[in-house]
Amino acid sequence: MEGQEDYQLLYEGRRSQPAPEEQEASALPRGRRQRGVEAGEGSVGREEARGHRRSQHRDRLGGGSMGSNVIGLPGVNPPTSEVVVLEPRSFDEMAQVIQYLRERKTVIMNLTLMDPAEAQRSVDFVAGGTYAIDGHQERIGENIFLFTPSTVTVSTPSSQGMPPLQRPLQSPTPLWPSGYEHLQAVGQH
């Protein structure tokens, strides 16, 4: 409350007797009057009062440092990221993919339902759009691609200094006989 009382005294003291510059300025036309008062010494007191109020406000919020003018807004949450998973059937759907990227949404495209030539054309088109918005692209599987806007960073094990996962060159041998071999063995007994 002490700050509010100081403000009241400062405000009442400033308004009770107009400064000589304000009296002179009232005789000037309106546009010149505003500029003259702002440039005159009367504005220095107002600026000091504003600075005093700002520092009190900062102290109340607990951010007494002069280096930051950023304050948090209560009730405002940061925007959430959205991932869109698509299985397009034709090249005509690629314009919508670009729109998702422009809206800062991550897109995963599964192109297994498309003709291979049209799928290649689609990937090239979306890759060009992704490049234009400084986005990122990654192939994450056979005919499956990840496209992200510039606000999303894609990291892979190799980019983090971890060894990449080793994939087997051939399918593992089963530990039990397949059903067909088992049927042959039963028929021979």
Swiss-Prot record:
The keyword Aminoacyl-tRNA synthetase does not apply. Pfam families: SepF (PF04472). Keywords: Cell cycle, Cell division, Cytoplasm, Septation. The keyword Glycosyltransferase does not apply. It is found in: Cytoplasm. Its main location: cytoplasm. One of its GO terms (cellular component) is cytoplasm. Residues 1-75, 155-174 are annotated as: Disordered. GO terms for biological process: division septum assembly; FtsZ-dependent cytokinesis. InterPro entries: Cell_div_SepF, Cell_div_SepF/SepF-rel, SepF-like_sf. Cell division protein that is part of the divisome complex and is recruited early to the Z-ring. Probably stimulates Z-ring formation, perhaps through the cross-linking of FtsZ protofilaments. Its function overlaps with FtsA. Belongs to the SepF family. Homodimer. Interacts with FtsZ. This is Cell division protein SepF. The lineage of its organism: Bacteria, Bacillati, Cyanobacteriota, Cyanophyceae, Synechococcales.
